[in-house]
């Protein structure tokens, strides 16, 4: 068995075309979604990622802006900028690129974003809505993972799904989404005993811990679906996933590559949530 490669770039391309069509439809009502991104400091990876989001938004017809603040910017100034964006009727979605400098509290900043413009889905209100099954902004990487599974026609009902990692960004929300899809979900973490036994039972594995080579051929059953969220740079700057890709693709039924798997869908879902925010505030959702 050779695994089906779940090509995130192609899935994202198709999804973004659908978003572009919806943006064009929205423009007929006189509304154009706008994404505002706050970047504090000069972290190279953050700058690159923010530029990718801006470019992707503009490519599908949205307006996008980057508010680039100096590394030494105070928390008060960041919160003031957020307040301005919260009250700007032209802004559909807001996100703050992390990590933030040490003088700025990430939690305070995330809680200061208007929940109706929180396209990252990290505001406590939106996290709470996710867990009581209300419509909300779902964190983008978990949403992207579910789109990959949907695109591949993978039926999750009754399947054993194992999630490695319990972060609020990926592990916990994707576990909730898998549960909503009627999978039986197990979360593994650094204190889990006998991790291999759990992995061996998994029909679907989502690994999101940033530990290259964690999941190997020895702890995956034949025919499992593997979603690799890891993206750790090696000494040459090449991205490595959590999964031993070359050996596991010989026994899995489907697998995401790194890079080019989950990553393209994460940015796509930022655009998805920005469009949703604009539709919701204009009363244009069905």
UniProtKB/Swiss-Prot annotation:
GO terms for molecular function: methenyltetrahydrofolate cyclohydrolase activity; methylenetetrahydrofolate dehydrogenase (NADP+) activity. Belongs to the tetrahydrofolate dehydrogenase/cyclohydrolase family. Its EC number is 1.5.1.5, 3.5.4.9. Transmembrane segments: none annotated. Homodimer. HAMAP family: THF_DHG_CYH. NADP(+) binds at residues 165-167, 190. GO terms for cellular component: cytosol. PANTHER family: C-1-TETRAHYDROFOLATE SYNTHASE, CYTOPLASMIC, C-1-TETRAHYDROFOLATE SYNTHASE, CYTOPLASMIC-RELATED. This is Bifunctional protein FolD. Signal peptide: none annotated. CDD domains: NAD_bind_m-THF_DH_Cyclohyd (cd01080). It catalyses: (6R)-5,10-methylene-5,6,7,8-tetrahydrofolate + NADP(+) = (6R)-5,10-methenyltetrahydrofolate + NADPH; (6R)-5,10-methenyltetrahydrofolate + H2O = (6R)-10-formyltetrahydrofolate + H(+). One of its GO terms (biological process) is methionine biosynthetic process. Catalyzes the oxidation of 5,10-methylenetetrahydrofolate to 5,10-methenyltetrahydrofolate and then the hydrolysis of 5,10-methenyltetrahydrofolate to 10-formyltetrahydrofolate. InterPro entries: Aminoacid_DH-like_N_sf, NAD(P)-bd_dom_sf, THF_DH/CycHdrlase, THF_DH/CycHdrlase_cat_dom, THF_DH/CycHdrlase_NAD-bd_dom. Pathway: One-carbon metabolism; tetrahydrofolate interconversion. Keywords: Amino-acid biosynthesis, Histidine biosynthesis, Hydrolase, Methionine biosynthesis, Multifunctional enzyme, NADP, One-carbon metabolism, Oxidoreductase, Purine biosynthesis. It comes from Staphylococcus epidermidis (strain ATCC 35984 / DSM 28319 / BCRC 17069 / CCUG 31568 / BM 3577 / RP62A).
